[in-house]
Amino acid sequence: MRTELLCDESKYTDILACIFEASTNNVDQICTPSGLIPRIGEEFIRDHCDFSAIIDFPYGISETKIRVHEILLCQSRGIKSIDLVINRYDTENGNLHSIRKDFKICYEVCKTKGLRIRPIIEYRLADNEFLPQLCYSLRENGADEIILGTGSVVDDLLDNIICSRLIEENLDINVISCFPVLSQEHYDMFNDSKIHGIRIKSYKILDNLCNIR
């Protein structure tokens, strides 16, 4: 199972600790809000760790032109992977047209610059009918992987696992689940469910996981 680590620490010492813990554990990628990218040495980004930049974290409510500007800034610092937070109000209101328009523009910018882009959906805000429509639309407009949750909304472990599996099975697209995994038991439940991957919310949790695989 793919394992990613969310790094949204405010202190520079914690950012360094996050990078160190990710490097010494079996973490596939460090995912950090775009605003923190300038605080991370480019040598880490370009030469040592696999980073993704989370654009418009955690609400996704900025105008498209601002989101594009952030993408370009991150690309200039060596970032190769972009995680785009889908507008939470559009998600809650089922505004598929607005989401599709924004994502297509950001996708084309990333494609031109040789970047991978993945949408982040705050799935707890979407109703049961809209969520599969949204995921299908994002897949058809270039997404090859979907991240469920920013980690900023209260979630339920079983709901998350069930939702992730339904999306993967019905829409044939990989899902990364961002859930507050707190123990090896939580981790094993996700791993046993055969979900493509998880995103751990804090580097401090890594000490509780003795078997990342």
Residue locations for each model-derived region?
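Conserved, mostly hydrophobic/aromatic
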Residues: 40, 74, 119, 146, ...
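Glycine-rich, proline-tolerant flexible connector loops at the mouths of alpha/beta enzymes
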Residues: 23-39, 81-101, 147-158
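Hydrophobic faces of well-ordered beta-strands that scaffold small-molecule active sites
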Residues: 1-8, 28-32, 49-57, 82-84, ...
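Catalytic cores of alpha/beta
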Residues: 62-76, 126-137, 165-177, 181-197
